[in-house]
Amino acid sequence: MAARCAVCGKGPQTGFTVSHSHIRNKRTFRPNLQPVRTTIDGENVRVRVCVKCIKAGKVQRVEA
């Protein structure tokens, strides 16, 4: 399953881990995705949404 937000489309980014001696190692920054039950087209569906979208209220949670 792709590490991508179902609402905003945020996905992984690449960058570097930089040590104290400034040695750079490539790494991946992944979005903080959480499974959320929400209603899409009248159906309760479980989607993976980033926490930024959850905090912004872009997703309405449905109780199981």
From Swiss-Prot:
Species annotation = Bifidobacterium adolescentis (strain ATCC 15703 / DSM 20083 / NCTC 11814 / E194a)
List the gene name: rpmB
- State the GO CC annotations: ribonucleoprotein complex; ribosome
Q: Which SUPFAM superfamilies match?
A: L28p-like
- Which Pfam family, just one, is annotated for this protein? Ribosomal_L28
Question: Which InterPro entries does the entry mention?
Answer: Bacterial_rp_bL28 (IPR050096), Ribosomal_bL28 (IPR026569), Ribosomal_bL28/bL31-like_sf (IPR034704), Ribosomal_bL28_bact-type (IPR001383), Ribosomal_bL28_sf (IPR037147)
Q: Which UniProt keywords apply?
A: Ribonucleoprotein, Ribosomal protein
Is Magnesium a UniProt keyword of this protein?
no
Q: Which GO terms describe its molecular function?
A: structural constituent of ribosome
Q: What is this protein called?
A: Large ribosomal subunit protein bL28
BP GO terms, sorted: translation
Q: Does the keyword Ribosomal protein apply?
A: yes
